[in-house]
UniProtKB/Swiss-Prot annotation:
Compartment(s): Plastid
Organism: Cuscuta exaltata (Tall dodder)
NCBIfam families: rpsG_bact
An annotated GO BP: translation
Keyword tags: Plastid, Ribonucleoprotein, Ribosomal protein, RNA-binding, rRNA-binding
Name of the protein in question: Small ribosomal subunit protein uS7cz/uS7cy
Keyword Protein biosynthesis in annotation: no
Subunit architecture: Part of the 30S ribosomal subunit.
Homology family: Belongs to the universal ribosomal protein uS7 family.
Length: 155
């Protein structure tokens, strides 16, 4: 065990235009090969497309989408007596948001089409409405946790 103290949590930074932490989380997750300016371009174009589609505040749509996709509980594999059980575990808000962002980006990458900004904006609008692949992933995770509720005492 480490003799040092626990490391303090890093506070998430804000993005330069919207001053929003969620936008920055999206930018950092969509980032590939260190091309952060390209990641910002994609996100900002997606936000503009959301504005055009819904004619409402795009950041509220983003917040609603992430709130809809954020899981309360997940399953972790745990070995007990030679067999592996899926043990349901509650997760914190920060970890839940990180999972939600990851699932939203994975779902938008799976969508047909070439333009990532368009795919991301479509997925975010769908998630805000309560449909889409990312919402399905959250429901599937919750179903798995419910099905394995008997193993909750292995925590």
């Amino acid at each position: 065990m480490s003799r040092r103290g626990t490391a303090e949590k890093k506070t998430a930074k804000y993005d330069p235009i919207y001053r929003n932490r969620l936008v920055n989380m999206l930018v950092n997750r969509i980032l590939k090969h260190g091309k952060k300016s390209l990641a910002y371009q994609i996100i900002y174009r997606a936000v503009k497309k959301i504005q055009q589609k819904t004619e409402t505040n795009p950041l509220s749509v983003l917040r609603q989408a992430i709130r809809g996709v954020t899981p309360d509980i997940t399953v972790k594999a745990r070995r007990v007596g030679g067999s592996t059980h899926q043990v349901p575990v509650e997760i914190g808000s920060t970890q839940g948001k990180a999972l939600a962002v990851r699932w939203l980006l994975a779902a938008s990458r799976k969508r047909p089409g070439r333009d990532m900004a368009f795919k991301l904006s479509s997925e975010l609008v769908d998630a805000a409405k309560g449909s889409g692949d990312a919402i399905r992933k959250k429901e599937e995770t919750h179903r798995m946790a419910e099905a394995n509720r008997a193993f909750a005492h292995f925590r």
